[in-house]
């Protein structure tokens, strides 16, 4: 399926499920999973996802990683909605390890990809969702999904087939090096692992400087470094 943006499709999925039951977001992960819903009371920031829809960015915008606890969060869930926008920003070795960690949950997962970030087509917000053929949500929502995605499916297919994956990988490699150099130049900790796109820091002494307070949640300062 495809939509005008990945956020459109994810918002529809969360809204449809939250109309019937609770939806779980991993604490500290992406706030965008809930902003389009009219059922805020059913969208929970909690790690206990048993038998419910679990939503997570891969890697998480909490800290730029996919942790063991996050994998457990997905394994316990009845279904998963995975936002893969930042997956290409991991190093090749980490992408391989992350893909292997996700393999057991793919059969129950909806995979959401934004061409604007995940595949570097920054002039487009086009989003694609990959849904297993026998996923239970297809029986419930396929007619609706087909109705509002049919216009974008052909556009998405042509855009994807035109991608030069080697060129995209080169861009990600250059960005990763630029971010590392920027962190060094500012005297900030350099964490080699995880996404170069987002880095999280826990301030020493617990005091957060005033300019960084808007970027702080759950005691972590998060920087989206590609926009600097």
Where are these regions (language model features)?
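PLP-dependent class I/II
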Residues: 1-226
């Amino acid at each position: 399926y495809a939509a005008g943006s990945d956020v459109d499709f994810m918002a529809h999925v969360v809204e449809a499920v939250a109309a019937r039951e609770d939806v779980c977001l991993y604490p500290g992960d992406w706030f965008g999973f809930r902003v389009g819903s009219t059922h805020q009371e059913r969208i929970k920031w909690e790690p206990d996802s048993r038998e419910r829809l679990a939503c997570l960015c891969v890697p998480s915008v909490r800290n730029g990683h996919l942790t063991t606890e996050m994998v457990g969060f997905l394994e316990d869930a009845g279904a998963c909605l995975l936002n893969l926008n930042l997956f290409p920003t991991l190093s090749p070795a980490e992408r391989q390890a992350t893909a292997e960690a996700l393999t057991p949950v793919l059969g129950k997962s909806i995979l959401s990809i934004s061409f604007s970030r995940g595949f570097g087509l920054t002039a487009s917000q086009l989003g694609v969702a990959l849904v297993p053929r026998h996923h239970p949500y297809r029986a419930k929502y396929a007619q609706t999904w087909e109705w509002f995605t049919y216009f974008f499916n052909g556009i998405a297919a042509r855009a994807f087939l035109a991608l030069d994956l080697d060129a995209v990988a080169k861009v990600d490699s250059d960005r990763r090096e630029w971010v590392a150099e920027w962190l060094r130049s500012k005297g900030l900790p350099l964490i080699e692992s995880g996404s170069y796109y987002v880095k999280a820091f826990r301030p020493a002494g617990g005091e957060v400087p005033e300019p960084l307070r808007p970027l702080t949640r759950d005691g972590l300062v998060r920087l989206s470094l590609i926009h600097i």
